[in-house]
Amino acid sequence: MSEEKNLLEVSHLKQYFPVRKGFHTIPLKAVDDISFAIKPGETLGLVGESGCGKTTVGRTLLRLYQPTAGRIVFDGDVLFDSGEQYDEEGKIIVDANGNPVKKKSIDVDMLPYRKKMQMVFQDPYSSLNPRMTVEDIIGEPLDVHKLYSSRAE
């Protein structure tokens, strides 16, 4: 029996946001070096206290935020790879000057992938727009991805 490939593979994902402190800008580490894999048919729930980065992970995977570093592979396609090289222990390989050793970075158009990926939030009252009808909420992704030929469909 062959080993089933991963549907989603996340390696060393980092999402930092710049924060101004006086004359300096420092990085706020919202997500710092997270790695996991999901096989077809599996479900992953991110659980943690408020402000720990759960939503940021989801938005970064969907590329609503540009990742700071790491690698995202969905169904065998590399969606993002910042190019850092890692050793067996997960540490970034650096050159003699202390600079990260990189290969070519990869960045792709996400529209074809977003119809296959989604985030589901636990609280439906903050997840669903109360000004939209159920028909509008369900129909919005169908409109975006042009998944019907007529309005009746």
What feature does the model see in each segment?
Residues 1-153:
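ABC transporter nucleotide-binding domains
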